[in-house]
Amino acid sequence: MAFLCAPGLTFFLTYSIFSAVLGMLQFGYNTGVINAPEKNIENFMKDVYKDRYGEDISEEFIQQLYSVAVSIFAIGGMLGGFSGGWMANRFGRKGGLLLNNVLGIAGACLMGFTKVSHSYEMLFLGRFIIGVNCGLNTSLVPMYISEIAPLNLRGGLGTVNQLAVTVGLLLSQVLGIEQILGTNEGWPILLGLAICPAILQLILLPVCPESPRYLLITKQWEEEARKALRRLRASGSVEEDIEEMRAEERAQQSESHISTMELICSPTLRPPLIIGIVMQLSQQFSGINAVFYYSTSLFMSSGLTEESAKFATIGIGAIMVVMTLVSIPLMDRTGRRTLHLYGLGGMFIFSIFITISFLIKEMIDWMSYLSVVATLGFVVFFAVGPGSIPWMITAELFSQGPRPSAMAIAVLVNWMANFVVGIGFPSMKTALENYTFLPFSVFLAIFWIFTYKKVPETKNKTFEEILALFRHNNGRSMLNCTNSLEPQSMNSGIEHAALMVSEEKTQHDSLFGTTSFSLTVEGMGPYPLSDSTNLLGPGSSSYGPGGVLGLAGSGSGLGGQCYTNYGTNLQTPQAARKCHYDEVDDYSFRRHSAHGRITQMKGKPLILGPTIKKDKKKERTDWLTASERFLEGGRSTHQGRSAASAPHHPRQPPPVCPSSGPXLRSASPPDSASVRSTSRAEEPHQPQQVHHQQQQVHHQQQHQSRYATHEYVHCSYEKEVVCDQANPSQAPPQQPAPPVQQHQQQPPPPLHHCQQRKHSHSPHHSRHTSPHSHHHHSHHSRHSRRSRRQGSGSLPGAHQGSANHSVMRPSICTSRRHRSVTDISTTNVCQDPACSDREVQEIMVRRTCCNTTATNSSSRTELAQCFAEDLYGSSRRPSSCCTSSDYCYQTDSTSLYGSRSSLSRNNSIKSASALVRKHHRSQRSLLPEHRHPSYTSISLRGLNASRPNSQLGSLTSIFDRAKNMAPEGSTLERQSSKGALGSSELPEYACSPSPIRWSFLADGRSPSEMEGAVGGGPEREQEEEDKLDAWQVPEPEPEKKPCRKITTSSSVYDEGPSTSAAAARKRRGSKGSRGSKGSGSYHCEFEDEATTTVMFHQDAGEAYNNCCSNNYNYIQCNTYLDQDLQITSEDIHQYLSKGDATASDILNNSKNYPFQPSNALEFQYKNNFQQGQANANNNNTNTTNTASSDAAECFQNYRAISKETNLNQTSTEQLSPTNINLSTSSNNINIVFSSSLERNANEVKFINNRSGASGGSEMGCEVGHHAGYLPYTYPSYDYTNMSGNSHFEKPLGIDELPKEFCGLEGAGGGGASTTSEHSSSLPSPQPLTHHQQLHHFESFDAASEHNLLAAQPMSPGSPLSGSVNPAGDDFVQMHHYHHANSPHSQSHHSHAHTHTHGHHVHHLLNHPAYDLTDDQFRLGSALKRVRKRARKYTDFLRKK
């Protein structure tokens, strides 16, 4: 009764389940109906045979005919069960059941008319057809019930399947007795009654809803899924179920259409498939079908009369029904695994009793009754466990994608075993006689052991949590995991900070694993930690000073100093951050790169070191001891397993320090800081004395290490690896010192210095930095002002407003948060040994990084093998996964799994990164200034092509469209998931589609005129030569001419690279003069010198839970864990075109791109990456040069003659202020509507107006980065099915401008020149006038009141937390509107960050150069047209 009153068990849910289980009742009825009339059917066959052939049939032949009648039912079941998966996907769960009833009616009619037709062949055919019907039922019904049942009732409702089977068995046995239909005249009616369940289901089932999971995940019909859930739950609040389904879809989207062969070959899905198969075999080979089919004859052979045997058979059916009812509440209370073990154990015992009763029945008369009791006990335990659990657990072990195929295979195996038992039991009974049940006893013992060892508990687990276990082990050996899937509660208080580590189980101890951390802070929710975070303080390492992860290479016995860290790099001391790998052998490298684990021990993070078999000890080091060791230079050594735990303030997070390990697996993408480092102001529990000691040590270290810096190497992303060597003018080259010596010379960086760099990238960061850090940073970075003025790299972290606040190149330390894009220009150019460089999350190792000696290709292949083993956790990984011509690197590609609730609970979130590859053809290409090619094409690499090719938005359809509309001469590439990683012969699991990985390829060109533009004399050239890749053969370089040294200025709040768009144009101008400092002609020469592959990897960090819980827009919440990674060519452009931008440019610092949630991605993106065309206006960097306008004009001319195509339109008409609307096909607002079957029904693309430059020498062409965007709003409602959203007002997110700008003419079209067009490379509009360029704005979200191009507060604990309000000071400080300034107006108007919003607007309106004309484009009217047309599309979708 408690189950009947359980929450969630509504009337309509009960009705739907009853209607569905009629199919299982059909299965039970036809299983037992052939048993009772056995003698009658045999007599009928004898009569037919005698009438045909005129002779009597032998007893052996009649037994064979009857066996065929019994077993052909199982043959049909095999066929139907195997077709169940296809039927479920093709017609749906409900649709398949309805169609299946046609077979049931046909089969029942054939059996019913068998005697009338005087043909036992019709009986065989009818049994076969009804077998197909029952096989489909056994596949579709459990699937349907498991998908409509709520989580808390799924086990009990799954048992209803077996209840219906037992009821069908009992009904067939009762009707088959001689007093009812068990006669010569009644048995055809008995068989024909199978038509009743089919007709009843045809009447009842149409009222029931389709499976919501099928509607939402498979068909992408969200509104229908919501309606079905509302009916089933009798409630309008179904968001929890919807979120669980979305989580399942996100976690398993790469397997959404997995075939049967893919299921069998998949290493991740093979273990649950084996479990499902064995569970089905445990049901059939337990011997239960022998009891069902031959119970009457079995009891008669035991000594019972025929009448008594029939009543005993009825008793078996009745006990089955009763025990199945009893097992329903036990299923969710005791658990599936436990009940199955009880059932198998009891059946084993009673099968022994049955065998004993057969042996001694002739000696003891009452032993015949013992056989009856033993048989009844056998049936009782079958009903408790193996009767219902195999059907249920098979559906639970698989997610939505592989579930149909898995159920088909399981049902096929079940029916095959059913057939074997049915056809073989008579012969086995004749051969074994009294030992008939002994083979079943052996099977029961085997199945019990397998269940105990291998089968997990699935009670109260979501489908994602169940599958997490198998993904966790990557399809290899499973341990006894009874409780491994239990939810792990994560306390929200910082005093109970815990780290979740998901380890890869490897086949030998030389393999590496992947880790993922999350820190749960009270009031903040899950907060992923970067792998570069040390929870234990500055002096403690994750494995102790000798562990590779904590202090890589500091232990004795290793030949090399620098080791690339794999796994958890909680804090990488100084020596560990050097990539000097030429003396370390592969074994040592792999041996010391093992896992680490961090567990929660009474609120203290306890760190368990790498597993070493011969050393099982655990050492715990106190915080202060670790700090002292840190200050002493980190010379302590430690071997074996070590740990460090540290008490800290209960309300403060432990101090963290970023690491520069070039090969980290992190919870954030490259150049991102996923953990907010605590500043000095936030550490009251830290003694001030420690700070001064650290500062003093750092100063000593800084001056001490100036001449030793060249000995160390930082491995960069790719062939952009730059040696960390001192300036040649300051130190002569030296030979590398011994590893231990190097480590002693280079103590780890102090805590506060790391903190300063962590906060030095954004204006928001600076307000968290203590004065001590500022002073020290100023003192530390006043050495290389010259390189900064030359623009020799984008160096975030500088304080440009003061002479003492310029940054030296070695101290670069960029930090970005999740979903930001990586700044290519700052890729690991840190020369300072104390610098934490950037947080590089790629895994990349070089043996001779910047070494002069060449390295053969075989060693690189070996390293590729190591990386492949680490990435996929298998020693069988071929090295071809990583090509020998490139560095072999990957990110954490462990699949995302877990529903949204489990992600919140377990924080089991994996991360990925943004990766960059460059194949340099010249030495100069290594320079940051040469990383801004003009890209001519972008193509999609389909690593996650889950949508069928026939659907709109699939990779095939988009690719075909791109080929048809691509300009002549453009490049389009498409690679398969295996070919993308270098081989088409790899096993499926080696380079299989990853659910967190989309990749884009971009073929680019670098302007030749940029060569030498950033020179600095012979010293600079010598430094560049030292940075040349050791594996590259230098090519003859063009003549290098010195260029003008540009000094830029900006606000005191600006922290970032000194190079700007204006400076870049000046350098180009000086280059155009061939070395002269005056302006000259600008040469628009483009030479194909570099090819760049840009790989964007989806990052799945803490922001999913945080942004959704803090009412941020749905798009970012949805796409954050959505495996269809939404990155357009616009984002790639932003990624690649910001090398010369300053740090306060929000696009380059911390913008979280609002990725477009659609697969309808454009490929062609023609020539949008202007050299050095970054956002100078954003930083108020107003430097002029007479060559600036020439440079911009040259680029405009180059772009004007280039062929540009919008793939979403057929017209190539250039955009102008007159056609920015939705009235024609040639517009720059792409609203892409696909069919209703498409997952993402529509999208709103970026709007970006290209404007030229004019104004002559009076006003330089200040090219704005991302200028000219029309404002748009990402809606907060469900974006995947617009017809399901009834509460929105502006459906496509096109919103008004702020009131101050709505009436401004020219505001929309008047953006300054931008480096990008529309994401699909729309043709450039005509250049606008000088007045039109004076004002442009960034994309402003009026609904959420923050700038979409700003840093979205993805985590409340980050320095960038809090929504940016355009009306407040924060918005003006970071996101004030920019406009071009003529020289005479610079003093009149200054973009100081202290301006308020109203003051800034007022000042803009009163700008002397601002003027309104009637013939200019009126943005307000355009927006009205946009919204009007958008609403029409939405209304159309609603009606559809």
Curated annotation (Swiss-Prot):
Chain positions carrying an annotated carbohydrate: 460, 480
GO CC annotations, alphabetized: membrane
Topology versus the membrane: Multi-pass membrane protein
The organism's place on the tree of life at top rank: Eukaryota
Ranges for region Disordered: 628-708, 725-808, 966-987, 1000-1083, 1304-1330, 1380-1401
TM stretches of this protein: 68-88, 96-116, 128-148, 163-183, 187-207, 273-293, 311-331, 340-360, 373-393, 406-426, 430-450, 535-555
Entry-linked CDD domains: MFS_GLUT_Class1
Membrane-side (Extracellular) residue stretches: 89-95, 149-162, 208-272, 332-339, 394-405, 451-534
Keywords for the protein's UniProt record, in alphabetical order: Glycoprotein, Membrane, Signal, Sugar transport, Transmembrane, Transmembrane helix, Transport
Biased composition (Low complexity): 686-704, 1313-1330
Residue ranges annotated as Cytoplasmic topological domain: 24-67, 117-127, 184-186, 294-310, 361-372, 427-429, 556-1440
Biased composition, class Polar residues, residue ranges: 669-678
Position of the signal peptide: 1-23
Biased composition (Basic residues): 754-789
Its biological purpose: Facilitative glucose transporter.
Homology family: Belongs to the major facilitator superfamily. Sugar transporter (TC 2.A.1.1) family. Glucose transporter subfamily.
Name of this chain's protein: Glucose transporter type 1
